[in-house]
């Protein structure tokens, strides 16, 4: 049995969940991703079963290389979420394979990442269908909505993170997601806001401050 995923992180998670060794697809095929696609000589994979996780992240070029290495008689299981963001590279391989109707597939409907009665599940399903529930802005036990201008976001994050810390939580218990790197509401600035709260600079610690430019 061979296990692989598009990224190192996904491969590590796959290995942890199965208790079996897993690798990136590139490593499985013995390539580094910098070769000339037309000149790559892919050797046939050994084994009887190949499982590829996070298939939605696989682009057309990588899938082509993978197919070159699959020998006749090897069974292949592709695992993924067609509704996740598509691959960075060209193509929507996993989505198109399912839409083609040429493959047998099973769709898992039970969500284990959210507790029973979670409103996030219903909200995500509605947004995926292009709808916005009327109670989107109404505070729920497991989610809240705070309207804010771009310049107001850092202060809002500061208040939320400070409150979170005061309740005894650490930075490892919190995730901040942003759709971009720059702007006041971007990743770079919000990381600085979070660092000032959870790991501020202090004369009591030996630290090095590095600035780019």
Kindly give the residue locations of the regions a language model identified.
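ASCE P-loop NTPase helicase motor core
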Residues: 1-137
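Short, flexible surface segments
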Residues: 72, 212-213
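Conserved helicase motor core of P-loop NTPases
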Residues: 82-212
């Amino acid at each position: 049995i061979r296990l692989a995923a598009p990224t190192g992180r996904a491969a590590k998670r796959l290995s942890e969940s199965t208790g079996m060794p897993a690798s990136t697809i590139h490593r499985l095929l013995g390539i580094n991703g910098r070769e000339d696609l037309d000149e790559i000589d892919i050797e046939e994979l050994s084994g009887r079963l190949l499982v590829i996780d996070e298939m939605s992240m696989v682009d057309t070029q990588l899938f082509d290389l993978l197919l070159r290495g699959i020998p006749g008689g090897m069974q292949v299981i592709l695992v993924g979420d067609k509704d996740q963001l598509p691959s960075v590279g060209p193509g929507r391989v996993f989505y198109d394979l399912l839409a083609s109707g040429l493959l047998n597939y099973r769709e898992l409907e039970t969500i284990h990442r959210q507790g029973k009665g979670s409103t996030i599940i219903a909200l995500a399903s509605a947004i995926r269908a292009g709808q916005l529930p009327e109670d989107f802005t109404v505070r729920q036990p497991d989610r809240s909505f705070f309207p804010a201008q771009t310049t107001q976001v850092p202060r809002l994050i500061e208040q939320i993170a400070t409150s979170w810390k005061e309740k005894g939580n650490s930075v490892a218990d919190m995730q901040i997601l942003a759709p971009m790197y720059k702007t006041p509401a971007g990743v770079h600035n919000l990381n600085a806001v979070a660092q000032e709260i959870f790991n501020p600079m202090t004369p009591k610690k030996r630290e090095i401050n590095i600035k780019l430019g």
